Amino acid sequence: MNHPCRRHFFNFVGIVALFCTDALFAKTFTNAQRALDITLVPVVNASNNATGMSVHYVLSPSKVPASGLALMFDTLQPSLLRTSDQVTMLHVADDKGDVALAPPVVKQMNDRSFQVWSATRPTSGPLHVAYVVPVAAAKPSKRGPHIDLQAAGGGLSGAFVSFLLLPDSRSEAFRVHLHWQFPAGQMAVSSNGVGDFSGEFNASRLDDMLFLAGPVKTYSPSGNSSGFNVYALGLPEEQLKAVASWTARAYEVERKAFRVPASQPYRFLIRSYDGGPIDSGRSSDSSFMLYLPTGFDTGRVELHSLVAHEMVHSLMKDLDDASGEEGDWYTEGTADYFSKTLPRAAGLYTAQQYLDLVNEEAAQYYTNALRDVSNKQSANVMWSGRNAWMLPYARGAIYLADLDAKLRLHHSTLTVLDLVNATSERIEHGAPATDTTWTGVLKDKVGVWALTDWQHMMDGQLIMPAPGTFGTCLIGSATKVGIFDLGFAKPIRVMANETVSGVVKGSNADEAGLRNGDVITETIDINPIAGSFDNLIHIPIRRGASPMMISYNPRSGWVTGMSWHLSSAGAPQKCSH
């Protein structure tokens, strides 16, 4: 149950006081799993603004001799850069009293990095840990997935990884009991349900859970599956209804495609605040979180595509066991592919909207400077540049669309959806969530040609799709395209108050008049430009005391690519879905 409490500053005295509440956690477990009792309290200031998360937990002792206590806090790198969202006011105690900790050090673990605090002595009995993590900067200099701890609509939002500091036994399953404390009239919802929850979880599964806590608005669209519900912080009622209504219809389509029971709970979480102009999403088990900038147009087809993309992640099995980002060709490629084809098949996009989305995908692939690098290489550099991250998404989607067309050309009764569902089924039955399972499905159900095509894609060979790719209503044709190139080195992100440097002599930026030392005065979302074959970029700058607008085509050179068009005159009316 939820525990109402007075709204107040949660200070260090309050944290220490929690160590006196042993009775609350006086449960004895007879099995080998350790009990982990967590209490979460959103911290608010005198103005009732959420400023951080207070965490207190009690961990029962291990029955197996341990090498020593170490607590790990994910740095969120390389996709994010922590700012103010650091561990503060950390206090650890056991049966013998306070446990002193050595200064934290950063350690790498596979593709992730952690701050690690180590105890200076062996611990004894139940372990009590308490600390506070303040909210992150609303507009960080490096914006990756929306998993960081953010204030929105008078509450808190993010993923549990944004604030959890847990023992270093990442694979150990704990018997978790999680409790929320907040004022009456407020609530918390996570990937695991509304309010408190219990279950068996390891650190990785806890980290991945998404949440909203505070004055959360709820909405259940009529006519949808009984398990589908929408929750939001910071979003006006009308906007909430608009985005929820389309999402509910898309969810029904995707749920059926991926064979998810109508009664299975599904939680669509939304956080809206002034955190930059780019809408974004993050998925978890049977849930996903959408970030919307304040005042965002919720009727945009690009938003619908994003929502459909994130739901795909949460309804099928990704290649989560792949090293680093090497599974993103599948994990993100399937999400991009099905977020276009499934809603279109259900009539949720018009023919013109579908065409625009397909050409956006094509531009992200064919105009990408990294388009010829291997999947392994792209995984290592996808967070290094402006549109580098787009490559595994777009290349994976183009590959899957090509595969679907070739299945029809080979007179197969199977579709890519059938192959993906077969892959998910094998993973659910214990197969590794890696390329091996996908290639096993291709070998068993399709044939050598499909394995060859897959290997060519993984090697970075250019994909020029077969006729019928993306359906019969669209026709693809080869064309010459320019490589996306802003023409200057810094800043990587085109953000307000950043100074331009490294303008390339002779580039389109140089020819348009952009100069080293110019100060950008407005943040620009480059994603729609990188997802276009010909959109110009317009950069407002200040040179000395003079404001100026620099406009140019951010592309260079000419290479072979493909674009799509409607199959005949009047196709928007003739193309059935």
Task: Please state what every model-predicted region is.
Residues 20-21:
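N-terminal signal peptide c-region/cleavage motif recognized by signal peptidases
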Residues 27-42, 51-58, 86, 426-577:
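Beta/coil-rich, acidic/histidine-enriched accessory regions frequently appended to metallopeptidases
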Residues 38-40, 50-69, 90, 247:
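Short, well-ordered beta-strand segments enriched in hydrophobic/aromatic residues
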Residues 79-146:
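A surface-exposed beta-strand-loop module
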Residues 83-92, 161-167, 173-193, 202-208, ...:
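Zn2+-dependent metallopeptidase catalytic core
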Residues 133-172:
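Glycine/proline-rich low-complexity spacer/linker segments in large multi-domain proteins
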Residues 218-327:
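Juxtacatalytic substrate-recognition/specificity segment
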Residues 325-397:
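Acidic/His/Gly-enriched intrinsically disordered linker/tail segments
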